[in-house]
Regions:
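Iron-sulfur cluster-binding cysteine motifs and their immediate structural context
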Residues: 1-31, 35-51
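Iron-sulfur-associated redox domains of electron-transfer enzymes in respiratory
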Residues: 48-267
Length: 267
């Protein structure tokens, strides 16, 4: 068989062919990173969508909250701010809107404490915010699974905060990362987001309701620069190191940064 784009793109060799030449994904190897979906020129692979349950919750008037990844800011133009998104989401029927960058600040603070404790005990730690990376460690490097940080992701941190304030809350994460769907479906972390929507999915709902993103002043800033840069390569590390500086935990932490799955494998 010719090597197809999906198989070529897979960082963990999770795609094979059956006797009919049809591509098969090995669920015991797949890390849910979504690279095969983006690489397939035929659109033959798709991620699970939560559009229907989100629409139903909105139509039923449930306490549903939107939480957007920091990458959302500026994703649709320099004039489209988090305040633009807040107004649009409320127009759709969401109770409120939160910047998950604030969850990045929360995560950095807790993870800094965890790093400091591990440093004192001579242990190594790997971050837990990227579900594709966590899946890679658990499935392909199980001997390192105990080194994964127990601190929840920024998405989960904000979701827990919302649910602590409103026990009836349903939380929806909006962002560019398909792997976040795996965090919700596979990891089953208490208090985490109930649903995940990609930008194309939330835009589909907005189009159906004739809701547009409008330019607004950038005055809805609840997160620090470090919290907003979590998705950058080394962003989590930078935020945690900054939290360590601001605390009494002064340690000489040696860090290893990796950009993408291939670098993670080498690290």
């Amino acid at each position: 068989h010719l090597k197809r784009p999906c198989k070529f793109s897979c960082p963990v060799d999770a795609i094979t062919y059956d006797e009919h030449g049809i591509s098969v994904i090995d669920k015991n190897k797949c890390i849910r990173c979504g690279k095969c979906i983006h690489s397939c020129p035929f659109g033959a692979i798709a991620s699970k969508t939560f559009i229907v349950p989100v629409i139903n919750a909105l139509r039923e008037g449930k306490h549903i909250y939107a939480m957007a990844a920091p990458a959302t800011e500026g994703q649709f133009g320099a004039d489209i701010t988090m305040e633009s998104w807040r107004k649009a989401m409320k127009e759709l029927g969401f109770v409120d809107f939160y910047d998950v960058g604030l969850g990045g600040d929360m995560t950095a603070a807790y993870e800094a404490e965890e790093w400091a404790e591990a440093y004192k005990e001579g242990q190594k730690k790997v971050t837990s915010c990227c579900p594709a990376f966590v899946n890679m460690v658990r499935l392909h490097y199980p001997q390192l699974a105990d080194n994964i940080s127990t601190t929840v992701s920024p998405m989960c941190a904000i979701s827990r905060m919302i649910k602590a304030q409103d026990p009836e809350a349903i939380t929806v994460f909006i962002g560019p990362c398909l792997a976040k769907k795996s965090e919700v479906v596979d990891q089953q972390i208490e208090g985490n987001a109930d649903y995940v929507l990609t930008y194309s999915e939330i835009r589909a709902i907005m189009k159906a309701k004739d809701v547009e993103l409008e330019a607004c002043p950038n005055d809805n800033q609840t997160a620090s620069t470090f919290g907003k840069r979590f998705a950058n390569s080394g962003g989590v590390t930078a935020a945690v190191l900054e939290s360590l500086k601001e605390s009494d935990n002064c340690i000489d932490a040696k860090v290893c940064r990796a950009n993408g799955s291939q670098e993670c494998k080498k690290a």
